[in-house]
């Protein structure tokens, strides 16, 4: 009797766990979901990095390419774009609730939301708050997502909040498998990130 109850309880617990996992993420593709969860847990703990690379942006009113520098220290970020991006260099810095945008030959602007700043000053509807997750090859945790895994159980693509994100290559840096090339499409905006240098660092414990 005890064994039967234990089996029934374990089965119910398993179903509850699967339901909880699927409530936020729908996973498909070639990869192993268990390996994906391990990979995801490792990257979720990565809260510091420096990125150097290139960015290409195609928007209804302006398009161009330039260089990308991104410094992340837990909830603080410093993202710099420079080169022929149509509007010159731009620097976005801040943390949740306190964000500043500096645009060459225009000035400095502040807001509680990075999305609001970019849309008002540059005309880009870009989910900046999701980018810290997407750039690591992870879905943002606060909304539903549809994931496709590659043969290594890393993200090949994800769909979230009206955006399609594709990952075409990864490299291993300091024990982390991190994206090298990312394409984002949504809200009349196409963005390509080519990451030349990843310097990942786990800061918090």
Swiss-Prot record:
First and last residue of the signal peptide: 1-17
Compartment(s) where it occurs, according to its Swiss-Prot or TrEMBL record: Cell outer membrane
Covalently attached lipid (N-palmitoyl cysteine), positions: 18
A single GO cellular-component term on record: cell outer membrane
Superkingdom classification of source: Bacteria
Pfam family, one: LolB
Keyword terms of this UniProt record: Cell outer membrane, Chaperone, Lipoprotein, Membrane, Palmitate, Protein transport, Signal, Transport
Positions where lipid (S-diacylglycerol cysteine) attaches: 18
One BP annotation, GO: protein transport
Membrane topology type: Lipid-anchor
Subunit composition and interactions: Monomer.
Record function comment: Plays a critical role in the incorporation of lipoproteins in the outer membrane after they are released by the LolA protein.
Family note: Belongs to the LolB family.
Descriptive protein name: Outer-membrane lipoprotein LolB
